[in-house]
Curated annotation (Swiss-Prot):
The lineage of its organism: Bacteria, Pseudomonadati, Pseudomonadota, Gammaproteobacteria, Pasteurellales. Its EC number is 1.-.-.-. It holds the Pfam family 2-Hacid_dh_C. GO terms for molecular function: NAD binding; oxidoreductase activity, acting on the CH-OH group of donors, NAD or NADP as acceptor. It comes from Haemophilus influenzae (strain ATCC 51907 / DSM 11121 / KW20 / Rd). It is an enzyme of class 1 (oxidoreductase). This is Putative 2-hydroxyacid dehydrogenase HI_1556.
Length: 315
């Protein structure tokens, strides 16, 4: 079996990647562009990738390909319909980040409520050293306990975020689907969550109905001074509308671990805004990436490959 790993830098270098037990050849590339994909994969039986695009046109030129093993949960980079038509299996990994993502979200909540980014930025400019008092009060500090958290997406991540939030004294509301006519038990109507929540956190999948879920209209329905957190998918948010809501002061702040385009352009409006807005926190899509989570991820990727090859030999 010929295995090609197309974007190995999607795994931190200090995490060792196990090799399959069956006889194989292993070729690894740090990055692969769209123009390089076909040449690198044309003789491969198995491809490992995180984000390299496999659309219908690309898949049609890879007759030897049997399996695409994705080092992530999302499968948006693969045309699943075309892959099925061509007999190419696609395997992703779920559940590996069920601790690290919720912990990241809780950390962002505390960072926003206590204005940590602003205080940290000030210290690079020695502002405390210039103070005439033992402290100073340039940024608002509000308690997490007693705040209301609106969770959009009640899967394993959203549920765990809610559990942790309850543990630190927050009230948790799970939002019903935006256009739902009936509100399920355990959920709160979509607009009501926007109205009540001091913090909104996004954990829903990216679909045609959730793209731009948070836009100018929904932002206007949020409580003035509320915070927005997104560790889900970048396109869940209309980025320009978010910048406007921050600039006008309608939102108290935002924390993002994902963007519409990744990596973002240097002139992305949010990237530019973060340079001057202490209430805007951006982390580079690393909420999922604790050492234990990544170790679990690569282990499950290899398990997917091993199981696929075993099934292949049984046919």
């Amino acid at each position: 079996m010929k295995i090609v790993f197309l974007d190995s830098t999607a795994i931190p270098k200090h995490i060792s990647i196990p090799r399959p037990s069956f006889e194989h050849t292993w070729t690894e590339y740090e990055h692969t562009s769209a123009e390089q994909t076909i040449e690198r994969v044309k003789d491969a039986d198995i491809v490992i990738t995180s984000k390299v695009i496999f659309d219908r046109e690309t898949l049609q030129q890879l007759p030897k390909l049997k399996l695409i093993a994705i080092t992530a949960t999302g499968t948006n980079n693969v045309d699943l319909v075309a892959a099925e038509e061509m007999g190419i299996a696609v395997r992703n990994v779920t559940g590996y980040s069920s601790t690290t993502v919720p912990e990241h979200v809780i950390g962002l909540i505390f960072s926003l409520k206590h204005s940590l980014a602003g205080w940290l930025r000030d210290q690079t400019e020695a502002k405390w050293a210039e103070s005439k008092q033992f402290c100073y009060f340039d940024y608002p500090i509000t308690d997490v306990r007693g705040s209301t958290l609106g969770v959009f997406g009640k899967g394993c991540l959203g549920t765990e975020v809610g559990r942790l939030a309850n543990a630190v004294g927050m009230k948790v509301l799970y939002a019903e689907h935006k256009d739902a006519t009936v509100c399920r038990e355990g959920y709160t109507p979509f607009d009501e969550v926007l109205k009540q929540a001091d913090i909104v956190t996004l954990h829903c999948p990216l679909t045609e109905t959730t793209k731009d879920l948070i836009n100018a209209e929904t932002l206007s329905k949020m409580k003035k001074g509320a915070f927005l957190i997104n560790t889900g998918r970048g396109p869940l948010i209309d980025e320009l509308a978010l910048v406007d809501a921050l600039k006008t002061g309608h939102l108290g702040g935002a924390a993002l671990d994902v963007m519409v385009k990744e990596p973002p352009e240097k002139d992305n409006p949010l990237i530019l805004a973060a340079k001057t807005m202490p209430n805007l926190i951006i982390t580079p899509h690393i909420a999922w990436a604790s050492d234990s989570a990544v170790t679990t991820l690569v282990g499950k990727v290899m398990q997917n490959i091993e199981e696929f090859v075993q099934q292949l030999h049984q046919k």
